[in-house]
């Protein structure tokens, strides 16, 4: 805001071995990195979260450059049973609600008593937040409490929603872990608030949102590695399979494909 880069960010970048830093942001930064300017070179890939304008800009430039995902708005789903502390659950829901009016805080539980207690706790805690207006809008517009008949039905609901952050706040989190199929990041147990994953635990917190955890993964080292396939056959090895290759190609009507193999063995 004052025209300077936060020194903590600069220190982290130096520790990570970053050699170039450009002081820019927003959709315009995405455009500059994708197409290049006089002062910013074009890049091959753009990663990381942002607001709705950044997400839309990344969608626009995809194809010109690679991207990791279209991320946001932020989501948290707390799967909780009746043994949970409702104040903790409410605090965890609000940790994402304060991000953005469009953020989605969701509680899925098999306990009606917990559902009521968490609802009451939200009303206590929201006014205490510096970003209370944002948290209030998020909870009112996008917040949900889903009451299920049992824990297994609750897990089914989680898998359908496929949340960005999933807190498994139940008595035996490892006992139900194998049932969980779709989530960006899974926080196991009552002592693992979402903020632990954001700031300290280690896994990247750029995560799939809007149900895309059904088919995509968090940002990770693979996003920064480009792979190629390698194929080598000897003459004898190719000759042994040449008729089968030609047969596949001819069945597709691609006779030049077949010819490129069989010509090597014509006398």
Task: Mark where each language-model region is.
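Active-site-proximal loop->helix
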Residues: 2-16
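Conserved NAD(P)+-binding/catalytic subdomain of aldehyde/semialdehyde dehydrogenases
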Residues: 15-104
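A conserved active-site cap/scaffold subdomain adjacent to cofactor or substrate pockets
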Residues: 69-141, 145
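Glycine-rich, Lys/Arg-enriched anion-binding loops that position phosphate/diphosphate groups
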Residues: 126-167, 171-172
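C-terminal core of ALDH-fold dehydrogenases
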Residues: 160-267
């Amino acid at each position: 805001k004052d025209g300077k880069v936060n020194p903590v960010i600069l220190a982290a970048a130096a520790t990570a071995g970053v050699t170039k830093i450009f002081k820019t942001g927003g959709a315009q930064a995405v455009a500059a990195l994708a197409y290049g300017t006089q002062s910013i070179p074009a890049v091959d890939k753009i990663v990381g979260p942002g607001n709705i304008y950044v997400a839309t800009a990344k969608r626009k430039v995809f194809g010109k450059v690679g991207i990791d995902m279209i991320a946001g708005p932020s989501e948290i789903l707390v799967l909780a049973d009746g043994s949970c502390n409702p104040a903790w659950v409410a605090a965890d829901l609000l940790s994402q609600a304060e991000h953005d009016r469009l953020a989605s805080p969701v509680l899925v539980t098999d306990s009606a008593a917990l559902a009521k207690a968490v609802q009451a706790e939200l009303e206590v805690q929201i006014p205490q937040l510096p970003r209370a207006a944002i948290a209030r809008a998020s909870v009112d517009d996008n917040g949900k409490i889903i009451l299920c008949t049992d824990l297994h039905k609750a897990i089914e609901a989680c898998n359908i929603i496929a949340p960005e952050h999933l807190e498994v706040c139940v008595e035996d989190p490892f006992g139900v872990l194998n049932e969980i199929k779709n989530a960006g990041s899974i926080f196991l147990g009552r002592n693992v608030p979402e903020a632990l994953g954001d700031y300290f635990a280690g896994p990247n917190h750029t995560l799939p949102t809007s149900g895309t955890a059904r088919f995509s993964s968090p940002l990770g080292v693979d996003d920064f590695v480009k792979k190629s396939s390698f194929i080598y056959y000897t003459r004898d090895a190719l000759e042994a399979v040449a008729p089968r290759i030609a047969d596949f190609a001819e069945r597709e009507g691609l006779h030049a494909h077949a010819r490129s193999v069989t010509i090597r063995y014509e006398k």
